[in-house]
């Protein structure tokens, strides 16, 4: 959430930033709401002050046995109480109107984010590794998985409908191995603390990270009103909600391997075959909580941690910076890491690393107190996939496929596979 004081002082900056995102100007509307609220707050405060003063005057009048004045003052206090009963309710309503309006405004892109309308305007930063030249026509992961007998979409549809997968045998173990490998890398070498968070959260948590109120259609809700997490970013970031974090403990770095649940409401007709776009999928998430001065450097560090996963797996990838029109709602800047999929002959996103500034910190009311200062500041937050486990499975299958349809297991994963070096067709 953006600061209304900052908006009052920088209306043109806000409107220019919204234009970069392809959105209409909103500063005048927000400032008008704020002025209406502030004017009303002024009237309420004046009435409260007069009520308190009149109440004291009643005591003085009674002490002086000036009953006429006392009765007039009592009548005035009664009128003020009646006014305040309605006015304070109106104040809460006006404050909510402003808060609701602010909650739908996206974050301000950093100055170095490239301008653009959609993913075609994203800018490639680097490529690591060269795509393998196969001596045969490489297959897509679902062709490989079904032929091996370890990937079952038909039974998954029987159980749950479209966009689900049943993995069996060594493919199920390979997905588990990938998640464990990523967690071990981030916790033992990258300094992240592993967390096992709830998979269901309250409204406040999903609001804090920015999925609510604007993107509720992308989420699954339980019958008792909780939300299935679309990413572990939600519970990990909200660990510090409504807290003042010790400055000496920053940055806080958390990681988790969790199932994620998404409705894919806007994805009709896209990636309908295979595991690329699922309602339920495994993902390793990284979250950092930092001070204002450290967040830019932390973004580069987090992205490097995600890239290291693919380097260790020997998977070709490229890193791009998203343009203003393709960034997520809460991001100031986002790097996407795209892995090479030979079956599709293209790069596909496997990790997205974003710095959010104090956007989420303000929504969560999460603060820190800089050393030597009395006042607090909102924390800066960052999140990144480290990485999407299902997509990593796809990438390993397609990049390590053999002409006979078997899958070679990358060396980094073999210790997690009980020494197995190849996945072959089920007997």
From Swiss-Prot:
Pathway: Aminoacyl-tRNA biosynthesis; selenocysteinyl-tRNA(Sec) biosynthesis; L-seryl-tRNA(Sec) from L-serine and tRNA(Sec): step 1/1. Disulfide bonds: none annotated. GO terms for biological process: selenocysteine biosynthetic process; seryl-tRNA aminoacylation. InterPro entries: aa-tRNA-synt_IIb, aa-tRNA-synth_II, aa-tRNA-synth_II/BPL/LPL, Ser-tRNA-ligase_type_1, Ser-tRNA-synth_1_N, SerRS_1_N_sf, SerRS_core, tRNA-bd_arm. L-serine binds at residues 231-233, 285, 385. Keywords: Aminoacyl-tRNA synthetase, ATP-binding, Cytoplasm, Ligase, Nucleotide-binding, Protein biosynthesis. Its main location: cytoplasm. It is found in: Cytoplasm. It is an enzyme of class 6 (ligase). ATP binds at residues 262-264, 349-352. One of its GO terms (molecular function) is serine-tRNA ligase activity. PROSITE patterns: AA_TRNA_LIGASE_II. It catalyses: tRNA(Ser) + L-serine + ATP = L-seryl-tRNA(Ser) + AMP + diphosphate + H(+); tRNA(Sec) + L-serine + ATP = L-seryl-tRNA(Sec) + AMP + diphosphate + H(+). Its EC number is 6.1.1.11. GO terms for cellular component: cytoplasm. Belongs to the class-II aminoacyl-tRNA synthetase family. Type-1 seryl-tRNA synthetase subfamily. Catalyzes the attachment of serine to tRNA(Ser). Is also able to aminoacylate tRNA(Sec) with serine, to form the misacylated tRNA L-seryl-tRNA(Sec), which will be further converted into selenocysteinyl-tRNA(Sec). Homodimer. The tRNA molecule binds across the dimer. Consists of two distinct domains, a catalytic core and a N-terminal extension that is involved in tRNA binding. PANTHER family: SERINE--TRNA LIGASE, SERYL-TRNA SYNTHETASE. This is Serine--tRNA ligase. It comes from Brucella melitensis biotype 2 (strain ATCC 23457). The gene is serS.
């Amino acid at each position: 959430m953006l600061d209304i004081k900052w908006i009052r002082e920088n209306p043109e900056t806000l409107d220019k930033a919204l234009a970069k995102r392809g959105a209409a100007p909103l500063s005048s509307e927000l400032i008008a709401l704020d002025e209406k609220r502030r004017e009303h707050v002024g009237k309420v405060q004046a009435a409260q002050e007069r009520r308190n003063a009149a109440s004291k005057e009643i005591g003085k009048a009674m002490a002086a046995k000036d009953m006429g004045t006392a009765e007039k003052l009592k009548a005035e206090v009664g009128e003020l109480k009646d006014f305040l009963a309605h006015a304070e309710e109106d104040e809460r309503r006006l404050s909510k109107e402003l808060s609701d309006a602010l909650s739908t405004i996206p974050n301000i892109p950093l100055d170095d984010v490239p301008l653009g309308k959609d993913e075609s305007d994203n800018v490639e930063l680097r490529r690591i590794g060269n795509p393998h030249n196969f001596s045969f026509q490489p297959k897509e992961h679902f062709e490989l998985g079904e032929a091996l007998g370890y990937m079952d979409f038909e039974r998954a549809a029987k159980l749950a409908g479209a966009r689900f997968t049943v993995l069996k045998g060594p493919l199920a173990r390979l997905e588990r191995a990938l998640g464990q490998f990523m967690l071990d890398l981030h916790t033992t070498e990258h300094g992240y603390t592993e967390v096992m968070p709830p998979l269901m959260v309250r409204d406040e948590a999903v609001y804090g990270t920015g999925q609510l109120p604007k993107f509720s259609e992308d989420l699954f809700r339980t019958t008792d009103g909780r939300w299935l997490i679309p990413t572990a970013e939600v519970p990990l970031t909200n660990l510090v909600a409504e807290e003042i974090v010790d400055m000496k403990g920053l940055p806080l770095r958390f990681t988790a391997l969790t199932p994620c649940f998404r409705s894919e409401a806007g994805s009709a007709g896209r990636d309908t075959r295979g595991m690329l776009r699922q309602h339920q999928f495994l993902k390793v998430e990284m979250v950092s909580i930092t001070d204002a001065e450290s967040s830019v450097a932390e973004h580069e560090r987090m992205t490097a941690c995600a890239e290291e996963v693919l380097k260790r797996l020997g998977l070709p990838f490229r890193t791009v910076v998203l343009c203003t029109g393709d960034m997520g709602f809460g991001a100031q800047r986002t790097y996407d890491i795209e892995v090479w999929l030979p079956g599709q002959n293209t790069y596909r996103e496997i990790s997205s690393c974003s710095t959010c500034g104090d956007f989420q910190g303000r929504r969560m009311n999460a603060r820190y107190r800089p050393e030597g200062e009395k006042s607090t500041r909102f924390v800066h937050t960052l999140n990144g996939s480290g990485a999407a486990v299902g997509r990593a499975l796809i990438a390993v299958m397609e990049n390590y496929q053999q002409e006979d349809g078997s899958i070679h297991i990358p060396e980094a994963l073999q210790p997690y596979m009980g020494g197995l070096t190849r996945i072959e067709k089920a007997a």
